[in-house]
């Protein structure tokens, strides 16, 4: 079974996030949606509200091939959460070069801390960018 972690603030969980999730489920058997908690970041919704919104959205999706989606909050390093789940990859959606530059730097740091976990970049579809 292949498992990936899809981290983000998801404030709120958008159609673009949903699209990245569905495309990820074509690659991985299980995806853990990791709702990041950053006390220094002002958000519209609390972490628990975001988790509940995502769980409700996932319930409406007809998951392909008996895939599984788990949603949870996390604080700290995403690689620590990935290790907890024995994930093989981190999934990052990118809308363009600015997102990519930032996410590539983060992926580099994650690779230094946890070289066994690959970061997979999925480009957002134009209608969701």
Ranges and model annotations:
Residues 1-129:
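Nucleotidyltransferase catalytic core that binds NTPs
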